[in-house]
Amino acid sequence: MEHTILILILPFLSFLILGLAGMRMKNGLAGAIGTVSLAGVTLLSYLTAFNYFAGGRTAEGVYPTLTPYNFEWLPFTTNLHIDMGIMLDPISVMMLVVISTVSLMVHIYSFGYMKGEKGFQRYYAFLSLFTMSMLGLVVATNIFQMYVFWELVGVSSYLLIGFYYTKKEAIAASKKAFIVTRFADLGFLIGILIYGYYAETFSFTPQLQVLAVAGSMIPLALGLMFIGGAGKSAMFPLHIWLPDAMEGPTPVSALIHAATMVVAGVYLVARMFPLFIGYAPEVLHWIAYIGAFTAFYAASVACAQSDIKRVLAFSTISQIGFMIVALGVCTSMNPHEGGLGYMASMFHLFTHAMFKALLFLGAGCIIHAVHSNEMSAMGGLHKYMPVTHWTFLIACLAISGIWPFSGFFSKDEILTACFQFSPVIGWIMTGIAAMTAFYMFRLYYCIFWNGEWKGHSHESGLGAHTPHEAPLTMTFPLMFLAAITCVAGFIPFGNLISSNGEAYTIHLDMQIAATSIIIAIASIALATWMYAGKKQPVANYLAHTFPRLHTAAYHRFYMDEIWLFVTKKIIFRCISTPIAWWDRHVIDQFFNFTAWSTHATADEIRDMQSGNVQQYSIWFLAGALILTLILLV
């Protein structure tokens, strides 16, 4: 496994080369350097996965945890130090495959999508940095190393979301993403420091006897760490940055939503899962409730959005909620006794990465063809874009949980885990799954059917044009991801990844599976009835019948306005303003008085320096007399 270090080195070298010398290169060469390096990373990731899982299990029946590279970076005490290295276990190996695959498809796709864009070389440099950061995060040997790459992921996302730096919206979106996640990451950092202090290590597997002494501080540390994960994974109410992140290039959205930034929080909880189960089960259950509410909220908002990318953004938030719920409903490390959700969450992370990347890249082809994000400017595109149409349909069926596509298998395992934990949670998540099928096929019909194409004129004034299929560099990733989406559900995932590391054979709960399929088909039928027609009479009727609800959902239930009120009216006015007054009128005046008194004293002392030697002698004798009296007394 010595070659695993190249998985990090190759994209880093690509970033350095393109960042330092990219502007001297032609676009094709810059793109080729980034893409070839990612192709190498992908091949190495596949080789690592094959060697790891083909190597077999240990005598205890679990896959081993390998550390091909590890060195001490910063020592603090005998036990407490920060290491840097590479750790391979089932979930880190799986994430290597997911990240490298999606990133490679994004690199290939960007050849066509970003053609002619200013800053092409800079774009590929940032893509390489983004990919390297996430790869480093998932192979981290300890929580502090994870935090280092965690922050690199945040910086990379800031650079890519704000790629179009001449657009005010892109600048605002990148700042918003950076600031919101920084607030969350503060909780993550405090949690890491508390954990390191009481556990006497930054390792993912501390000594049990040390944790027993730490008591309630470990649950506190884990809860604070989850705040960081909630910010990265856009959990309510820290989700507000993700929809605005759509201002970046569409391929970047695919990478952020499918394989990098937003799944980092899920990976964090999965990585710390043994500690959550052993020392903070109540925190884990609260995580489930937060995930369930987030999934419902995001699904509700997605039903009313008109921007194709924002529908997919809220879809991502909802699906991340599913993964978080699956982890939160676990009550045991044994998959047969309450630990099924761990495997289900990782399974859904894998399948979701493929079909969500497919959806975003398909959306990019559509935007590339019609030059608009608004669904009202689309319709009837199935005639003009057959490859995009069929691959997009496959992704919609997968995310809706229709057999035999991959989303059916992973979502069914999540629902089974939820019903094992609580029938109430199970039915809530089933209802959210139905909403998912509805808003995804609302999106599908508004884009590809819904009458004839409305037409669009180029900004250059060339007049209306007919939409066209994207070039092969853009459609090949669609076909590749669609193929994976069709077959990924049949991977024996439980044999590779489970909560306790032992092989687990997935058994479909036929009652739950049948119920979820029936409800999904009913939701698709409802979307067909409402949106497949040319004039959408039912949809328009409902929007006018419930205008306040529709408007509230369209405006994301005014969460942006609420956050603006909290920050501007409460934090800035009620907290920052008094603090600023105290700083100016108390702190500043204190130091001003100190400076004035020092200056006044100096003036008085200066007057004593008259140049008269006799006067100096008198002062000297007086001082000596005073010192003598003090010593005698």
Which ranges hold each PLM region?
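Alpha-helical transmembrane segments and their membrane-interface junctions
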Residues: 397-409, 413, 481-500, 567, ...
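Membrane-entry segments of alpha-helical transmembrane domains in multi-pass membrane proteins
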Residues: 1-9, 25-32, 80-98, 136-149, ...
